[in-house]
């Protein structure tokens, strides 16, 4: 008899994401496009289970306050669940590297050869993966997220962190 893994509770998910407008830096159309796609993809498919909160679904407000990343987690009816403040220090170098390579990527797609674009994109994805793993580590014991959810959240954190 084979064992099947337990099915994830479909209530352990985000149904809405809000980015704090005061936290969002000026950005160009490429960054705005990344943000819109990340929010759409995140809401479409995610695993998000705050420790000890029971099931959701949840809404998430993300902000930068001081030198901290704030995750304000609420139920769908806006009842508060928990607010987590995470230091931005572990993300600073990763976000800086991510945006440097994103700038190179956006320039390359206009003029470079397909091989050059692919090489830059592989580097971009590698840095993005590093940021996603760092976020999963920082959320460990607070909120359970799968890797794809962490990737989309890292994109949103990067948008907030980017100051144009």
Swiss-Prot record:
Q: What is this protein called?
A: UPF0262 protein Nham_0287
**Record's superkingdom?**
Bacteria
Q: Which InterPro entries match?
A: UCP032146
Similarity comment: family membership: Belongs to the UPF0262 family.
